[in-house]
């Protein structure tokens, strides 16, 4: 896969000092902490976009899915980032795994009957699946990450088979995807409350760059619409009826707060 997205850390280090110290929930944090918060939010947003691209490809290319489509979309997103083999993409995967872990922790890792029936795996499982594929793809590069998640050496060794299966499956299905998809990118106004989230998302450039990957990397029928908007919930969607990836500004805000809650203030 092409490395199209700009070095995120460099962009955010330029953005972070420009943010007012009292900007929404970033008051009381140092410039470095603010940069870390923004990096985490953008990297999780990036993983989410690739997850929605996974749904798009499953829909438009009629990709076979055995099991939950949500798990398949996570695996496609992880595979795309692993294929880039860059420090930025590796950091994005680490942040995505941590994002699922922190999300689960914020709900006390509660997963009731309705959750099990919903089609989504538990957040902690999604985090560990990402890490398993990481260490399965490159044990020397990601051993420390897997150890930090308390994945046993025995399981780390078998993660290689998990990765090989995903690589063979996804790589084979997307081997000759073509090029030339029509893609339209739209940013809608976020409003005053979500101004910071909109600014962070726009400045990161990830929306245009993932859209460009779809444009150059696949030949899909019709026009694919990328829309960033206010949704009244922290989420992202793929709508097969309109062939549209919808990203909610509230998700950026939620991710910033999620990471900020883990940091001490005033350092």
Where is each model-derived feature located?
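Sec/Tat signal peptide C-region and signal peptidase I cleavage site
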Residues: 19-23
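Short pre-active-site segment immediately N-terminal to the catalytic Zn-binding motif
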Residues: 30-47, 62-63, 258-267
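An active-site-proximal "capping" alpha-helix that borders the catalytic cofactor pocket
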Residues: 67-84
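Pan-zinc metallopeptidase signature
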Residues: 112-214
């Amino acid at each position: 896969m092409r490395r199209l997205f700009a070095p995120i850390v460099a962009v955010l280090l330029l953005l972070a000092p420009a943010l007012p110290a009292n900007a929404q929930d970033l008051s009381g944090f140092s410039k470095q902490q603010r940069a870390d918060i923004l990096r985490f939010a953008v990297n999780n947003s990036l993983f989410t976009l690739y997850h929605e691209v996974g749904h798009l490809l499953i829909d438009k290319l009629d990709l076979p899915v055995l099991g939950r489509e949500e798990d398949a979309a996570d695996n496609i997103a992880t595979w795309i980032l692993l294929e880039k083999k860059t420090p930025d993409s590796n950091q994005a995967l680490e942040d995505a795994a941590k994002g699922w872990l922190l999300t689960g922790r914020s709900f006390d890792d509660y997963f009731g009957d309705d959750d099990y029936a919903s089609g989504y795996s538990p957040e902690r499982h999604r985090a560990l699946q990402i890490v398993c594929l990481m260490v399965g793809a490159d044990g020397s590069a990601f051993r420390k990450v897997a150890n930090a998640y308390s994945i046993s050496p025995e399981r780390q060794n078998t993660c290689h088979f998990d990765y090989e299966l995903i690589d063979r499956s996804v790589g084979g299905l997307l081997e000759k995807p073509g090029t030339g998809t029509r893609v339209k990118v739209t940013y809608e106004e976020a409003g005053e409350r979500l101004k910071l989230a909109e600014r962070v998302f726009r400045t990161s450039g990830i929306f245009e760059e993932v859209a460009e990957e779809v444009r150059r990397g696949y030949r899909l029928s019709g026009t694919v619409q990328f829309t960033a908007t206010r949704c009244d919930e922290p989420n992202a969607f793929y709508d097969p009826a309109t062939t549209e990836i919808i990203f909610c500004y509230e998700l950026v805000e939620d991710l910033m707060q999620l990471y900020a809650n883990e940091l001490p203030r005033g350092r």
